[in-house]
Amino acid sequence: TKTRVANAKIALENQEILKEEQLVTIENTIKNTYELYQNTLFILEAQNQNVITSQNNFDRTQERFTLGQITSIEFRLAQINLLNSKTAVNNAKYDAKLIELELLQLTGEILNIAF
């Protein structure tokens, strides 16, 4: 019986160590996901600024096109640049939302439960 008690104590200690390891892993995962979320928000803001710049560039290009100072190819390039910057914003929003949902799931704010 002394052996059983000793084995039980060792098993309990092993379980406690595993529990602590899991808690550290979860905590690190949450911290990493939060940092990733902050980075995606920064990227989103940068992409929003890029849209403003692209819109200003397009507006100037449109004026110059109307005045006949640039070719239709240059005008089309400005259109494409504006479209690409708007697409990049949408992609950044999507990425930020995915990371936000992952963070909420990790912190228990949302659960994957079917009702």
Question: Can you say where each PLM-predicted feature lies in the sequence?
Answer:
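Acidic, low-complexity, intrinsically disordered peripheral segments
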Residues: 19, 88-115
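Secondary-structure boundary/capping residues
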Residues: 31, 70, 112-115
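Short flexible/disordered coil segments
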Residues: 24-35, 85-100
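Sec/SRP-type N-terminal targeting helices
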Residues: 1-59
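A sequence-composition feature that detects small, non-aromatic residues
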Residues: 6-11, 45-46, 78, 88, ...
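Charged, solvent-exposed structural "stalk/scaffold" segments
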Residues: 39-91, 104-105
